[in-house]
């Protein structure tokens, strides 16, 4: 087989469909978020405003977080020095797990190298180790959850997205004696809709199922202390496992689960994705602790963030720019064409100094291509007006459909 020819042909198909991914070469400017420096292929540099960061609250630039990380490097050095089991458990890891358990009102927590790994390792381990387990997975769950369930090789039942009737029908049809787990997200990353957590917990109680809630797009963002949608709705105690990330609203890196002492110890003891990898650097753990502690105490970032989301949506509506209506902070501006979506993104970056990454298939279904915009507390009124003005101009240029008020 001509491997190079195969690779080239497969890549060419992405180019021809307008969905080949190109990384924007940018450098975040410390203390100047959401500004960044863009490096062109010819070596030229240009300032841009980032509108697609998952550093939702700008905590990656927060002075408390940065100082905590610097202090940890000065105190501990760069890396953890090993796996958690072999010399890699630094005291910062222990403190971080205590902080996370407290955030979600759980007995225990366990940190991983990323949110992807925490989902993959936890769901895969549960699927492998619990005899006869059936995992009921929402149809729009993240790839890390899908891959984890697949890795677990247990029975998997897909239920229609956020459809309680379909979930109950599938629970009712399953073996009543089989162990069950319902896996779902709180805020879904591409459409920005929110799961009916209470009603799912009611079904879990009725059919004797565990619950696994991915809160990666909600932790830090919702609830009086940033514990997510489950905290906001007073439901944390009803969930078996709450999973989250340190790399979005908390502005650092890593993933975690929280739950009972027994379930966290079970994953710690059996999950290969936890056991056989180097622990997070102590500096990242220190930064995460500072970020979590700040957001537990400060409502300012969350309130300001919601204000920015409302401002952006209002201006988009005024210009007839179609965006998906949802109750979260994620603002998907709908284009519906892969080539046009990429073209708009390119022109925004090259001509307007606005960086928004196009979202195309397979991340979203074909004909639902979009610009996934994520306002932050640090975007000004002028930033928002500049973004919407540029979109208005490009919408007319592409003859794209306008939203009707």
Curated annotation (Swiss-Prot):
Pathway stated in the Swiss-Prot or TrEMBL entry: Porphyrin-containing compound metabolism; protoporphyrin-IX biosynthesis; 5-aminolevulinate from glycine: step 1/1
- MF (Gene Ontology): 5-aminolevulinate synthase activity; pyridoxal phosphate binding
Is Cytoplasm tagged as a keyword?
Answer: no
GO BP annotations listed: protoporphyrinogen IX biosynthetic process
Name the residues that bind substrate: 21, 137, 363
PROSITE patterns noted in UniProt: AA_TRANSFER_CLASS_2
This protein's superkingdom?
A: Bacteria
Q: Enumerate the UniProt keywords alphabetically.
A: Acyltransferase, Heme biosynthesis, Pyridoxal phosphate, Transferase
Family, as annotated: Belongs to the class-II pyridoxal-phosphate-dependent aminotransferase family.
Instruction: Supply the PANTHER family for this chain.
Output: 2-AMINO-3-KETOBUTYRATE COENZYME A LIGASE, MITOCHONDRIAL (PTHR13693:SF102), CLASS II AMINOTRANSFERASE/8-AMINO-7-OXONONANOATE SYNTHASE (PTHR13693)
What is annotated about its quaternary structure and interactions?
Homodimer.
Which protein is depicted?
Answer: 5-aminolevulinate synthase
User: Which species does this protein come from?
Assistant: Rhizobium radiobacter (Agrobacterium tumefaciens)
């Amino acid at each position: 087989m001509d491997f190079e020819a195969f690779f080239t042909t497969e890549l060419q198909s992405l180019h021809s469909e307008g969905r080949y991914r190109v990384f924007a070469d940018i450098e975040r400017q410390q203390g100047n978020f959401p500004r960044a420096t863009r490096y062109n292929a010819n070596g030229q540099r240009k300032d841009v405003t980032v509108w697609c960061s998952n550093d939702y609250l700008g905590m990656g630039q927060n002075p408390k977080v940065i100082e905590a990380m610097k202090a940890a490097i000065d105190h501990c050095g760069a890396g953890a020095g090993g796996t958690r089991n072999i010399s890699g458990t630094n005291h910062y890891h222990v403190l971080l797990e205590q902080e996370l358990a407290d955030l979600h009102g759980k007995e225990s927590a366990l940190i991983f190298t990323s949110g992807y790994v925490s989902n993959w390792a936890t769901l895969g381990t549960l699927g492998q180790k619990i005899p006869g387990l059936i995992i009921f997975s929402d149809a729009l769950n993240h790839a890390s959850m899908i891959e984890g369930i697949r890795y677990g090789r247990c029975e998997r039942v897909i239920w229609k997205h956020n459809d309680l009737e379909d979930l109950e029908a599938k629970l009712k049809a399953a073996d009543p004696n089989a162990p069950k787990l319902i896996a779902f997200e709180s805020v879904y990353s591409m459409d920005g809709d929110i799961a009916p957590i209470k009603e799912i917990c009611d079904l879990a109680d009725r059919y004797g199922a565990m619950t696994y809630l991915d809160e990666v797009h909600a932790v830090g963002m919702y609830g009086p202390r940033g514990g997510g949608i489950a905290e906001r709705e007073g439901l944390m105690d009803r969930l078996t496992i709450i999973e989250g990330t340190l790399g979005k609203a908390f502005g650092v890196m890593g993933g975690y689960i929280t739950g009972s002492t027994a379930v966290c110890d079970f994953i710690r003891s059996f999950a290969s994705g936890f056991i056989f990898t180097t622990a997070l650097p102590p500096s990242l753990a220190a930064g995460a602790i500072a970020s979590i502690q700040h957001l537990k105490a400060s409502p300012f970032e969350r309130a300001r963030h919601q204000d920015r989301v409302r401002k952006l949506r209002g201006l988009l509506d005024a210009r007839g720019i179609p965006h998906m209506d949802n109750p979260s902070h994620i603002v998907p501006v709908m284009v519906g064409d892969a080539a046009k979506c990429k073209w708009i993104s390119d022109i925004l970056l090259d001509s307007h100094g606005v960086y928004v990454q196009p979202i195309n298939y397979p991340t979203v279904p074909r004909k639902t291509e979009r610009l996934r915009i994520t306002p932050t507390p640090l975007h000004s009124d002028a930033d928002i007006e500049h973004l919407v003005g540029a979109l208005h101009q490009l919408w007319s240029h592409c003859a794209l459909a306008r939203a009707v008020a």
